[in-house]
């Protein structure tokens, strides 16, 4: 016969006669234990304490994929992670920062500094920048960017890359030379037209000032001729009608010597020979600058515009000459 003990699922046999012993109580089962786990830190990002593959939300990473670097960062306005593909040999620091601002309009200021705090110019190639660690400052918040180490290329690889760059540059120049020269010619024509528009009002004012200065200079020359005529007439009148030649001869000598002293003093002051053309030009310039100040005519600006116009015309002449030579070479090649 079977008996039920403390555990109804277990069976016991009755003791045989002669072997009966007082029954021992079965040991009680241990009390159940409960495992309690307490989470520490921010529950939203608790996995980051256990898995090293999760990237903090504000970290900027640089990885290489298919030979091109990918810069991953968090946009400040949308709080989204965004990847930027960088072309090391074509992109510059300025173009990369411009791409950041175009992607997120909330980026007001952006700059890149070296690890020791020196600012990197906008014309620096990204290939040079990604050789070392740097700091990216967005809206006055600095982020440390660690670039993966790249293997140093061998001398043969460097020489091949330089040769390839030179070959690509020459090929691009040959294919786009005519187009670039036409663009340059168009740009020079626009520059010449713009300079002429700026010079037109100045030319009108200058023409009026020149006419006024020329009139005053001519009047001064005629006044000098009149004074010399009066001097000659007075000496003749004193010689033949008032005094004799013996008395007037020393007077005319001293007058001639005084004129020589005046001419020598003019040379000392101006460092120029006393010639009528030099005196006229000097007097004309004096009248011209005096009248220019009265009419607020900027002589330096006018001279600068004239120099720029002359340089632009010379550059246009050279561009057209080179384009003409290229067309002649193409015609000869077609004939051959």
Swiss-Prot record:
**Keywords, sorted A to Z:** Calcium, Calcium transport, Coiled coil, Ion transport, Membrane, Mitochondrion, Mitochondrion inner membrane, Transit peptide, Transmembrane, Transmembrane helix, Transport
Q: Which GO terms describe its biological process?
A: calcium import into the mitochondrion; mitochondrial calcium ion homeostasis; mitochondrial calcium ion transmembrane transport; negative regulation of calcium import into the mitochondrion; positive regulation of skeletal muscle satellite cell differentiation; regulation of macrophage activation; skeletal muscle tissue regeneration
Q: How does it sit in the membrane?
A: Multi-pass membrane protein
Q: What would be one Gene Ontology cellular-component term for the protein?
A: mitochondrial inner membrane
Give the residues annotated as coiled coil. Answer: 179-210, 297-323
**Described purpose of this protein according to its UniProt entry:** Negative regulator of the mitochondrial calcium uniporter (MCU), a channel that mediates calcium uptake into the mitochondrial matrix. MCUB is required to limit mitochondrial calcium overload during stress. Acts as a dominant-negative regulator that displaces MCU from the functional uniplex complex and thereby decreases the association of calcium sensors MICU1 and MICU2, preventing channel gating. Mitochondrial calcium homeostasis plays key roles in mitochondrial metabolism.
Annotated localization = Mitochondrion inner membrane
UniProt keyword Membrane present: yes
Q: How does it assemble?
A: Homooligomer. Associates with the uniplex complex, composed of MCU, MICU1, MICU2 and EMRE/SMDT1, inhibiting its activity.
Primary gene name: MCUB
Name the UniProt record assigns to this protein: Calcium uniporter regulatory subunit MCUb, mitochondrial
- Which GO-annotated molecular functions does the record name? calcium channel inhibitor activity
Q: Say if the entry is tagged with keyword Cell cycle.
A: no
State the family named in the UniProt similarity comment for this chain.
Belongs to the MCU (TC 1.A.77) family.
Q: Which residues cross the membrane?
A: 220-240, 250-270
The record, for InterPro entries, names: MCU_C, MCU_fam
């Amino acid at each position: 016969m079977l008996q039920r003990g403390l555990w109804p699922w277990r069976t016991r046999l009755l003791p045989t006669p002669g072997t009966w012993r007082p029954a021992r109580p079965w040991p009680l089962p241990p009390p159940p234990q409960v495992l309690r786990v307490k989470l520490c830190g921010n529950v939203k990002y608790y996995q980051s304490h256990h898995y090293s593959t999760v990237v903090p939300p504000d970290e900027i990473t640089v990885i290489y994929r298919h030979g091109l670097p990918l810069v991953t960062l968090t946009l400040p306005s949308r709080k989204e992670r965004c990847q930027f593909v960088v072309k090391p040999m074509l992109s510059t620091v300025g173009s990369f920062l411009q791409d950041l601002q175009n992607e997120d309009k909330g980026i007001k200021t952006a700059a890149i500094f070296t690890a020791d705090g020196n600012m990197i110019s906008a014309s620096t190639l990204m290939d040079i920048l990604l050789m070392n660690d740097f700091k990216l400052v967005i809206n006055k918040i600095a982020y440390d960017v660690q670039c993966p180490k790249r293997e140093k290329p061998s001398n043969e690889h460097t020489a091949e890359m330089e040769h390839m760059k030179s070959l690509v540059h020459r090929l691009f120049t040959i294919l786009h030379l005519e187009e670039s020269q036409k663009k340059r010619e168009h740009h020079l024509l626009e520059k010449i037209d713009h300079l002429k528009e700026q010079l037109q009002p100045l030319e009108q004012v200058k023409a009026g000032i020149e006419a006024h200065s020329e009139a005053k200079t001519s009047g001064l020359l005629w006044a000098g001729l009149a004074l010399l005529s009066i001097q000659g007439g007075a000496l003749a009148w004193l010689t033949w009608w008032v005094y004799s030649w013996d008395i007037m001869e020393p007077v005319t000598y001293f007058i001639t010597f005084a004129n020589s002293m005046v001419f020598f003093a003019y040379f000392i002051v101006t460092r120029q020979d006393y010639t009528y053309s030099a005196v006229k030009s000097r007097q004309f310039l004096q009248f011209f600058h005096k009248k220019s100040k009265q009419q607020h005519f900027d002589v330096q600006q006018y001279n600068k515009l004239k120099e720029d116009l002359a340089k632009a015309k010379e550059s246009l002449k050279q561009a057209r000459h080179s384009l003409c030579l290229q067309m002649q070479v193409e015609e000869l090649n077609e004939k051959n």
